[in-house]
């Protein structure tokens, strides 16, 4: 049973890696080509990529070594933030949140591998699988919301949804695997993600029109009516 959990979380880690690689390819093509080519760019490949990952064989038919495949260049890609020009300054925070979620997922795989004998009931295992399946669409949503033109409110909403899903996965994994001490790094990672999320939230609020001040013309008309 623990093999099913390990494979499920491993597939999730693979989806994160595939999403990052697809994001790099998309952004390079959108920002490094002439404007007329940008207008003709079709974002469908990334949707097909993630969709293909979601339609793989059943977890029971996969080995952990087959699903946890790391791109040899992925670490360099994640550490390099110079490949995209972002005048808004929000893209780096989105990437940071994706990095944190990616790291948490990889470490959850390792923890699950070491906690097979401590697993609780099959219901707990099912909870992990259900929550893990909810994360990949959230990753897809965040990646697609990073396409220009950027909408701060959309970025805020989708990164919040992703972080909530990952936090939920952490909770059910802790409960199912009896994880207790030595997990400060999880809370620290989530706190770091919250800091980046706060920047996106402030940008979303700043993008909303200021409704605190009344319209001068409307105010004068109201006074005349009185």
From Swiss-Prot:
Subunit composition and interactions: Interacts (via N-terminal region) with MYRF; the interaction inhibits MYRF self-cleavage.
Keyword Transmembrane helix: yes
Transmembrane parts of this sequence: 4-24
Tissue expression notes: Expressed in differentiated oligodendrocytes in early postanatal central nervous system tissues. Expressed by CD4(+) T cells, the expression increases upon activation (at protein level).
Record topological domains on the Extracellular side: 25-226
Topological relation to the membrane, as annotated: Single-pass type II membrane protein
GO cellular component annotations of the record: endoplasmic reticulum membrane; extracellular exosome; extracellular space; Golgi apparatus; plasma membrane
Protein purpose: Functions as a negative regulator of MYRF in oligodendrocyte differentiation and myelination. Interacts with the C-terminal of MYRF inhibiting MYRF self-cleavage and N-fragment nuclear translocation. The secreted form promotes differentiation of T helper 1 cells (Th1).
Superkingdom of this protein's organism: Eukaryota
Name of this chain's protein: Transmembrane protein 98
UniProt organism field: Mus musculus
Stretch list, region Disordered: 207-226
Phylogenetic classification of the source organism: Eukaryota, Metazoa, Chordata, Craniata, Vertebrata
GO biological process, one term: negative regulation of protein processing
Similarity comment: family membership: Belongs to the TMEM98 family.
S-S bonds: none
